[in-house]
């Protein structure tokens, strides 16, 4: 019996003593996919021919060597990251990651431009999620779906429609629904006199985009708000209230991004607030440092609280977990592995909680016992259960994954000059 197995058997007994079945927890964890975001691997550059600079208030900071420059390099880097992460995974793509031998404008994207991604996903037994790309384009400089100019607005509406067909294609090819999330950077740097008209235009544009019914077996629409962005500090057309109302009234999923709110707000508190009103919720788990900085996800209090809300309320089939961070100052594969494994660790810790006992204490208003058990829970050997999970999935246990990342950096990433 290995050291990992010995530690697991001891941990299994300790959790059994408080009524928690570790085998059941591991089985449930296997059913909770994490959607990894492709854009960590190339600093949100994408593969459009003749693409412009990153815009829309999005910034990647740092210049760590080894950034993926081609679809082939990005998929190779993803292969390495996926090999170091246990459990069920998906990949989240932006429209700007299309592949073509000529320039394809945003309103002309087609499923065929993502055939290589579908083949890769099939080979890795992973689902795909999707995002229209409403930034880093000459026609996104002023606004997109809320633009006063109907021609520009129509261009972006066509992009949204085209992306829904790609998302549907993903779902049909891979046998799992693709969640397509709409986020736009539209807003204003300074004071706005007419805030209503852009929002009315956005409503009409979104309605036109989602007018064609697509089977939910293949595709789900989601909409994402933001408090502010660089260059749009004073007014954001797609605010939280706007998209919450839109999702409820139109039956779409709502996306909550951990970095898209005021620094004192947390999305863990918003999950139970919106779930009575929407069927599906998309999460972009991130780490905002004073603003939407998209730092790598930590195993911190908020990540744990997000996981706890999903597990305690058994929202397994209704909440879709995606990651959204991009750090160009560190090894990009390490960033994927750290962030994804941390999200999985948080879910496992939540699955190892004696929730029924805690809820009973809460209902009995025995808050002292509730606090005591929540604190004692932190000292239980969940790490041994996590190590067992990694071993069963044939991925490195503990810090050993870092050795593989360093070796890959030496043999592959260092050659990208």
UniProtKB/Swiss-Prot annotation:
EC code: 5.3.1.14
Principal cellular location given in the protein's record: cytoplasm
UniProt keywords, alphabetically: Cytoplasm, Isomerase, Manganese, Metal-binding, Rhamnose metabolism
Compartments in which it is found: Cytoplasm
Binding residues annotated for Mn(2+), in chain numbering: 260, 292, 294
Gene Ontology terms for molecular function: L-rhamnose isomerase activity; manganese ion binding
Catalytic reaction(s) noted: L-rhamnopyranose = L-rhamnulose
Cofactor note: Binds 1 Mn(2+) ion per subunit.
UniProt-listed GO biological process terms: L-lyxose metabolic process; rhamnose catabolic process
Cofactors named for this entry: Mn(2+)
GO CC list: cytoplasm
Signal sequence interval, chain numbering: none
Gene3D superfamilies attached to this UniProt entry: Divalent-metal-dependent TIM barrel enzymes
Annotated InterPro entries: L-rhamnose_isomerase, Rhamnose_isomerase, Xyl_isomerase-like_sf
Presence of keyword ATP-binding: no
Similarity field: Belongs to the rhamnose isomerase family.
HAMAP family per the UniProt record, alphabetical: RhaA (MF_00541)
Biological role stated in the UniProt entry: Catalyzes the interconversion of L-rhamnose and L-rhamnulose.
UniProt name for this protein: L-rhamnose isomerase
Native organism: Mannheimia succiniciproducens (strain KCTC 0769BP / MBEL55E)
């Amino acid at each position: 019996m290995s050291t990992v197995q010995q530690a697991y058997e001891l941990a299994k007994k300790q959790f059994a003593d408080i009524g928690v079945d570790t085998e059941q927890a591991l089985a449930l964890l296997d059913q909770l996919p994490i959607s990894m975001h492709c854009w960590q691997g190339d600093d949100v550059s994408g593969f459009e021919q003749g693409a412009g600079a990153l815009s829309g208030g999005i910034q990647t900071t740092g210049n760590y060597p080894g950034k993926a420059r081609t679809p082939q390099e990005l998929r190779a880097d993803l292969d390495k990251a996926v090999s170091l992460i246990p459990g069920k995974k998906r990949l989240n793509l932006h429209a700007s990651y299309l592949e073509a031998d000529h320039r394809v404008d945003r309103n002309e994207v087609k499923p065929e431009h993502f055939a290589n991604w579908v083949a890769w996903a099939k080979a890795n037994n992973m689902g795909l999620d999707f995002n229209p790309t409403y930034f880093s384009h000459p026609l996104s400089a002023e606004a997109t779906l809320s633009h006063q100019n109907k021609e520009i607005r129509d261009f972006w509406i066509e992009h949204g429609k085209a992306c829904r067909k790609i998302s549907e294609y993903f779902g049909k090819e891979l046998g799992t629904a693709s969640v397509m999330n709409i986020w736009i950077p539209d807003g204003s740097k300074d004071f706005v006199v007419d805030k209503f008209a852009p929002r009315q235009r956005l409503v009409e544009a979104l309605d036109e985009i989602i007018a064609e019914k697509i089977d939910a077996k293949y595709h789900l629409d989601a909409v994402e708000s933001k408090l502010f962005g660089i260059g749009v500090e004073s007014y954001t057309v797609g605010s939280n209230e706007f998209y919450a109302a839109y999702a409820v009234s139109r039956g779409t999923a709502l996306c909550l991004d951990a970095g898209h709110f005021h620094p004192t707000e947390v999305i863990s508190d918003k999950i139970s607030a919106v779930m009575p009103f929407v069927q599906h919720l998309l999460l972009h788990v991130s780490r905002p440092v004073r603003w939407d900085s998209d730092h790598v996800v930590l195993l911190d209090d908020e990540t744990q609280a997000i996981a706890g809300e999903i597990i305690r309320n058994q929202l397994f089939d209704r909440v879709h977990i995606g990651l959204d961070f991009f750090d160009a100052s560190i090894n990009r594969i390490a960033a994927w592995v750290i962030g994804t494994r941390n999200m999985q660790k948080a879910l496992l810790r939540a699955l190892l909680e004696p929730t029924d006992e805690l809820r009973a204490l809460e209902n009995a208003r025995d808050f002292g016992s509730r606090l005591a058990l929540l604190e004692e829970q932190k000292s239980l050997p969940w790490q041994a259960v996590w190590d067992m999970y990694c071993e069963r999935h044939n991925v490195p246990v503990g810090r050993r994954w870092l050795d593989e990342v360093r070796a890959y950096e030496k043999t592959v990433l260092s050659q990208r000059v």
